From Swiss-Prot:
This is Homeotic protein knotted-1. Its main location: nucleus. Keywords: Cell junction, Cytoplasm, DNA-binding, Homeobox, Nucleus, RNA-binding, Transcription, Transcription regulation. Residues 242-262 form the ELK domain. One of its GO terms (molecular function) is RNA binding. It comes from Zea mays (Maize). Residues 1-34, 213-232 are annotated as: Disordered. GO terms for cellular component: cytoplasm; microtubule cytoskeleton; nucleus; plasmodesma. Pfam families: ELK, Homeobox_KN, KNOX1, KNOX2. Forms homodimers. Binds to MBP2C; this interaction reduces RNA binding capacity.
Length: 359
């Protein structure tokens, strides 16, 4: 802000950095350039200036409280924007430029960029405004443009480079200011749209809870009044099916991974009851020698729904905990050691190294 102000030859404020210190700059500068800092500050109500060369009575009284004192709507008699352009601070009566205010306003109004400046100013005031207010501001800009064209006619404005630069710089500031105002509003709207989308994804069959509740209460009222008009009923089964389908579609990946994880944990724990019953039945029938062949293991796996690893682990644990060779089997094994140190029994080869199955 200060860089732009200094660019147009405007010095420091009459109030210095310390109390009681005053700095006066006598180099040449233009009064309108000192108002750059006023664009982002609230504008105080300005009294109408009598006898202006061009009066812009473009704002009618509104229903808002203090409408005539609202700087946003103070465009009549060159208020609001013009005062911001002319006065960054209230000029004192002793100011050598106080008498030039009307001439400065006339130059600003007659400048070719005035309508662009006014449009940018009104765009700032449209941010967050209700639709009716935004529409009214657009009408104001159109009315001002029409009045400006009528008042100026075909007259060419006098060329004044420093005023041209000021109008361009002021317009650029207003555009940037509008962007700064719009950004948080857009972020808030985007956040609300995401929340609304998430809530809609959880709604049932696209109907809001309010509609469902209102339908239910209407049915109760109709039944209590004895009327015969049939109201639409909520198909609970259909709603449940649609909700189930929606949830399965949304969480199918998560459920699949969870199912696999539970399946792994299930394999590490106890076997299903029916599978255990079938294995115990086979165990009872072959208690004397509970060593199933590979063919028998495959058959047991198919009938129980278990895999071969589970079958093998079950028999190993079962033999360790619940089986000991009978006396007859023990004597046969011992006799085998004394003769050939090995013998065959039920297709098994037994020696001092343990039990082995042939082929």
């Amino acid at each position: 802000m200060e860089e732009i102000t200094q660019h147009f030859g405007v010095g420091a404020s009459s109030h210095g950095h310390g109390h009681g210190q005053h700095h006066h700059h006598h180099h040449h500068h233009h009064p309108w350039a000192s108002s750059l800092s006023a664009v982002v500050a609230p504008l105080p109500p300005q009294p109408p200036s009598a006898g202006l060369p061009l009066t812009l009575n473009t704002v009618a009284a509104t229903g808002n409280s203090g409408g005539s004192g609202n700087p946003v709507l103070q465009l009549a008699n060159g208020g609001g924007l013009l005062d911001a352009c002319v006065k960054a601070k209230e000029p004192s009566s002793s100011s050598p430029y106080a008498g030039d205010v009307e001439a400065i306003k006339a130059k600003i109004i007659s400048h070719p960029h005035y309508y662009s400046l006014l449009t940018a100013y009104l765009e700032c005031n449209k941010v967050g405004a209700p639709p009716e207010v935004s529409a009214r501001l657009t009408e104001i800009a159109q009315e001002v443009e029409a009045r400006q064209r009528t008042a100026l006619g075909g007259l060419a404005a006098a060329t004044e480079p420093e005023l041209d630069q000021f109008m361009e710089a002021y317009h650029e500031m207003l555009v940037k200011f509008r962007e700064e105002l719009t950004r948080p509003l857009q972020e808030a709207m985007e956040f609300m749209r995401r929340v609304e989308s998430q809530l809609n994804s959880l709604s049932i069959s696209g109907r809001s809870l309010r509609n469902i509740l209102s339908s239910g209460s209407s049915e109760e009222d109709q039944e209590g009044s004895g009327g015969e008009t049939e109201l639409p009923e909520v198909d609970a089964h259909g709603v449940d099916q649609e909700l189930k389908h929606h949830l399965l579609k949304k969480y199918s990946g998560y459920l699949s991974s969870l199912k696999q994880e539970l399946s792994k944990k299930k394999k590490k724990g106890k076997l299903p009851k029916e599978a255990r019953q079938q294995l115990l039945s086979w165990w009872d029938q072959h208690y004397k020698w509970p060593y199933p062949s590979e063919t028998q293991k495959v058959a047991l796996a198919e009938s129980t729904g278990l895999d071969l690893k589970q079958i093998n682990n079950w028999f190993i644990n079962q033999r360790k905990r619940h089986w000991k060779p009978s006396e007859e089997m023990h004597h046969l094994m011992m006799d085998g050691y004394h003769t050939t140190n090995a013998f065959y029994m039920d297709g098994h080869f037994i020696n001092d190294g343990g039990l082995y199955r042939l082929g």
